[in-house]
């Protein structure tokens, strides 16, 4: 009886392995145009991907991509899972627009305990419906209304930086700027002031940092990706504690806004998405839009529906923007000549009077400052890579993509590729000047991604970045803090960060 059972088990295993082998062989034939290093039976390229384990994973990943990408494409098997890496500019627009490639991969599920099914993680149908709801909250008309908030929060930031300038103490720039971006996104998109810039400590910011570390562990540990295993670890218990803090924060914001609307004597203004304020039509903010919206079933969105979008917009609005500001200031302290040129442009356009507000018309004229921001995003995109799941077979420029495979696009690879940007590791803002040669192709620079699932807040982000940086550079001179700060080490923890906090010093400008 034992040998019969053993024989049947062996037969079943053999049939399964035969099925796997035949399936992989068939897919390999269909995807033969994709360049690939030699693969081993059944495990595929796991022996190559294993090199990512260990210190400096970002550097290891960069070296692996540079070694195995040909014509900026590659095919890699992780066991029975197929990954297609495509960073060819000829493919980008089609890749990012193809209906079959609008689904995020299963890797993004590690965010779902926190972000649930918001715009960042949701499937195509839900994402499509929600995006249509919230897009008006980030149009240019709305951004112009946000300028007053950008100005107000920038002034608070200037006061905080001035304290460091007077004392001569070192500045943890990311910590300082994260409070600014959190306050700004909450007041503009959610209509609520949270005052983190005025607080000595932000429990929410600390919780975000901690949960990103846990999510990073799940992404890098194949066993932790399994929910059954992960729920039996201490990391899960800690994650639940952090989620309680994070969801409590956002639910508090939602309730506060509901109370404010209910108490508003002009509550009738919130009955449509085109309320009037002092006789001028305005679009409702992100949160107000959600509060008045309905789902595909015709019913109002639930508190959970609203919370998952609020969590997503806060994460995307404050963390990703803060890292960009952090890397920008790093570049400015590393290249004081560019910092001074930005400052002189601000003086020329906005004047030297520090008390004068900066208008959106002036912001639009700060061309060199924008070039420095773009150069920062090229070298240090906050999202170094993105991945999409093929929900059906498709073909992009004669390259077949089978259903079920994952397609990876890497903005950091493209931004640092010498084929697209000469001297890619040199900070050269002038490459963005009008008429500069060689001309930069739009599909080689995708820090906000491209196509249907591109970042809907990119114009918002650029205006906010330019305004706060114009204020900072008009008021202070920023300097690096020693050699350690010049030789910056990077870490990929969901978003791109520095291994050690970036520290600098500020000096008041007379």
From Swiss-Prot:
InterPro entries, sorted: Cyt_P450, Cyt_P450_E_grp-IV, Cyt_P450_sf, Cytochrome_P450_Monoox
Membrane topology listed for this record: Peripheral membrane protein
Residues that bind heme: 455
Keyword match DNA-binding: no
Cofactors named for this entry: heme
Cystine bridges: none
Subcellular compartments: Endoplasmic reticulum membrane; Microsome membrane
Keyword Mitochondrion annotated: no
Keyword field: Endoplasmic reticulum, Heme, Iron, Membrane, Metal-binding, Microsome, Monooxygenase, Oxidoreductase
GO molecular function: heme binding; iron ion binding; monooxygenase activity; oxidoreductase activity, acting on paired donors, with incorporation or reduction of molecular oxygen
Listed SUPFAM superfamilies: Cytochrome P450 (SSF48264)
Pfam families, alphabetized: p450 (PF00067)
Enzyme class: oxidoreductase
Any one GO cellular component localisation term in the record: endoplasmic reticulum membrane
Bilayer-spanning residue ranges: none
Cited function: May be involved in the metabolism of insect hormones and in the breakdown of synthetic insecticides.
Entry similarity comment: Belongs to the cytochrome P450 family.
Protein name: Probable cytochrome P450 312a1
Lineage, top ranks: Eukaryota, Metazoa, Ecdysozoa, Arthropoda, Hexapoda
Gene coding for it: Cyp312a1
């Amino acid at each position: 009886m034992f040998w019969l059972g053993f024989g049947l088990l062996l037969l079943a295993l053999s049939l399964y392995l035969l099925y796997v082998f035949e399936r992989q062989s068939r897919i390999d034939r269909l995807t033969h145009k994709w360049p690939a290093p030699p693969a081993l039976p059944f495990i595929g390229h796991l022996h190559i991907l294993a090199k990512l384990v260990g210190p400096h994973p970002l550097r290891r990943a960069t070296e692996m991509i540079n070694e195995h990408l040909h014509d900026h494409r590659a095919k890699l098997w992780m066991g029975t899972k197929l990954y297609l890496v495509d960073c060819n500019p000829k493919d980008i627009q089609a890749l990012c627009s193809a209906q079959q490639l609008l689904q995020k991969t299963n890797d993004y599920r590690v965010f779902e305990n926190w972000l649930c099914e918001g715009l960042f993680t949701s499937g195509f149908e839900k994402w499509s419906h929600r995006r249509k709801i919230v897009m008006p909250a980030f149009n240019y008309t709305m951004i112009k209304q946000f300028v007053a908030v950008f100005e107000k929060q920038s002034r608070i930031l200037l006061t905080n930086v001035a304290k460091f300038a007077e004392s001569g103490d070192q500045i943890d720039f990311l910590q300082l700027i994260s409070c600014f971006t959190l306050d700004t996104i909450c007041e503009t998109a959610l209509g609520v002031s949270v005052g983190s810039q005025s607080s000595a400590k932000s429990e929410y910011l600390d919780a975000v940092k901690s949960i990103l570390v846990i999510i990073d562990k799940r992404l890098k540990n194949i066993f932790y990706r399994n929910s059954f295993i992960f729920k039996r670890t201490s990391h899960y218990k800690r994650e639940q504690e952090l989620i309680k803090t994070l969801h409590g924060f956002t639910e508090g914001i939602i309730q506060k806004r509901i109370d404010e609307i209910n108490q508003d004597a002009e509550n009738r203004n919130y009955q449509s998405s085109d309320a009037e304020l002092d006789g001028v039509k305005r679009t409702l903010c992100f949160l107000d839009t959600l509060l008045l919206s309905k789902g595909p079933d015709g019913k109002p969105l639930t508190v959970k529906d609203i919370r998952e979008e609020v969590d997503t917009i806060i994460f995307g609005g404050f963390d990703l923007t803060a890292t960009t500001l952090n890397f920008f200031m790093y570049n400015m302290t590393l290249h004081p000549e560019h910092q001074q040129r930005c400052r002189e442009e601000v003086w020329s356009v906005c004047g030297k009077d520090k008390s004068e507000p900066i208008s959106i018309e002036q912001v639009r004229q700060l061309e060199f400052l924008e070039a420095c921001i773009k150069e920062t995003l090229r070298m240090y995109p906050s999202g170094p890579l993105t991945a999409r799941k093929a929900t059906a077979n498709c073909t992009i420029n004669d390259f077949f993509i089978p259903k079920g495979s994952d397609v990876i696009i890497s903005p950091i690879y493209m931004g640092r590729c010498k084929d697209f940007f000469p001297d890619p590791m040199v900070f050269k803002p002038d490459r963005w000047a009008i008429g500069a040669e060689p001309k930069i192709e739009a599909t080689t620079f995708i820090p906000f991604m491209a196509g249907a699932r591109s970042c809907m807040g990119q114009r918002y982000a650029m205006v906010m970045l330019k305004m706060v940086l114009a204020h900072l550079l008009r008021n202070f001179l920023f300097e690096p803090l020693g050699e350690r700060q010049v030789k910056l080490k990077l870490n990929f923890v969901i978003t791109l960060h520095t291994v050690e906090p970036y520290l600098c010093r500020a000096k008041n400008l007379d």
